[in-house]
Amino acid sequence: MSGRGKGGKAKGKSKSRSSRAGLQFPVGRIHRLLRKGNYAERIGAGAPVYLAAVMEYLAAEVLELAGNAARDNKKTRIIPRHLQLAIRNDEELNKLLSGVTIAQGGVLPNIQAVLLPKKTQKSK
């Protein structure tokens, strides 16, 4: 008698829910935080997986754009300024994070068209 029930397979190496879903973000930790945070009385099994996937996608999107901004400025390290430029130059991310202030982010370079010097016509 092996104590594995009726014809069950031996339990192999445990696999995390993150790796099962093919994610880098921790599904188990997000599930724990959802339960502890009193957001709802009960939390479904799929909710933390979906939330982890959404958070991972948003992080990847912001980091991709910030990496491009860093490369444009000939830098190898992403700083808050690069995050600010990435978010504010992307229409959808700017709308999503409109109420967010990024410390040490600075502002977007912007000069009103009225203030620019007028172009004069050169006659031949």
Curated annotation (Swiss-Prot):
InterPro entries, per the entry: Histone-fold, Histone_H2A, Histone_H2A/H2B/H3, Histone_H2A_C, Histone_H2A_CS
Q: Indicate yes or no for the key word Manganese.
A: no
GO CC terms in record: nucleosome; nucleus
SUPFAM superfamilies, A to Z: Histone-fold
| Chain's role | Core component of nucleosome. Nucleosomes wrap and compact DNA into chromatin, limiting DNA accessibility to the cellular machineries which require DNA as a template. Histones thereby play a central role in transcription regulation, DNA repair, DNA replication and chromosomal stability. DNA accessibility is regulated via a complex set of post-translational modifications of histones, also called histone code, and nucleosome remodeling.
- Family affiliation: Belongs to the histone H2A family.
This protein's name: Histone H2A
Species name: Sipunculus nudus
The organism's lineage?
Eukaryota, Metazoa, Spiralia, Lophotrochozoa, Annelida
